[in-house]
Amino acid sequence: MNPPTTSDSAQTQSRKADHIRICLEEDVQFRDTTNGLERYRFTHSCLPEIDRNDIDLSATFLGKKLNAPLLISSMTGGTEEAGIINQRLAGLAQHYKLAMGVGSQRVAVEKPQVADTFAIRKYAPDVLLFANVGAVQLNYKYGLDECLRIIDMLEADALILHINPLQECIQPRGDVNFRGLLDKINQLCSKLPVPAIAKEVGNGISGAMAEKLIAAGVQAIDVAGAGGTSWAKVEGERAENAMQRRLGRTFADWGMPTAECITSVRAIAPHIPLIASGGLRDGLDVAKAIALGADIAGLAMPFLQAAVESEAALQDLTEVLIAEITTVLFCTGNANLDQLKHSGSLQRLQ
């Protein structure tokens, strides 16, 4: 890979700062498209026949045990502010034994001096950590060597390959050559020392797409469905011209709802490790996603908002999420997550 120019590095770093600011200050949530989970309701058990204090929320993902089925979803890195956010999130993940992913590490490949903003293993020695790079970069001179650097930077347990065609269409100078990418993913997965996770960024992965990705060697799927933060709107806010701003508005609600993605992927891949993310905002959403077939659930915006406030705000959020998930299990008469998945207690509303 040729060294990136100073201009390329500066643009990538500026984009990272813009993303944090826009997500926190502007209305960039989906407007009409929801995560789809409101179409489901749990059957209440008035006599659970279990002790709430005995409920077990532990989950195992990619061979590592978590104390709760929560992933602090990929968000940021590459700036001083992002480094502080990642450090706080890593400390939280370590304290509660949650999984965590970081934002795209492309900026640290282009500008190695910001790699420390991603180097969070020292704050989370026991945590399931996911490194992250855009899959499309495999068509832009990234290969195994760059991916190994990204993994080593984080001492990661897995590598997220995020797939974001719509975002790239609207992003200034976006990388839009997706031709032949599946073959390159296949070649990369066959050589990686850790599992690869395919992840969308808020527009969803269908069962048909998941089937192709799994055949290419991907070992886990994060559906990252619609209903939360719209990256079309985010990039529209950053847009440099009227065309891009128009695209951001037109495609603000583009994508498959998260609930639909979960059921679609599970129908074709009953055993693939599956992450539900995309518009999950509380423990009830998490429990519904798991009952639909996900193994763990990822949240980004709630953790980002708390992280910029304080470590105490992060702990308060996590305690509430855990209490909400526990309450769902208690009020459906399920002592653990496996029972919840197989209980049939989640019903689709007519």
UniProtKB/Swiss-Prot annotation:
It is an enzyme of class 5 (isomerase). It holds the Pfam family FMN_dh. Mg(2+) binds at residue 168. GO terms for cellular component: cytoplasm. CDD domains: IDI-2_FMN. Disulfide bonds: none annotated. Substrate binds at residues 15-16, 104-106, 167. GO terms for molecular function: FMN binding; isopentenyl-diphosphate delta-isomerase activity; magnesium ion binding; NADPH binding; oxidoreductase activity. It is found in: Cytoplasm. Involved in the biosynthesis of isoprenoids. Catalyzes the 1,3-allylic rearrangement of the homoallylic substrate isopentenyl (IPP) to its allylic isomer, dimethylallyl diphosphate (DMAPP). This is Isopentenyl-diphosphate delta-isomerase. It comes from Nostoc sp. (strain PCC 7120 / SAG 25.82 / UTEX 2576). The gene is fni.
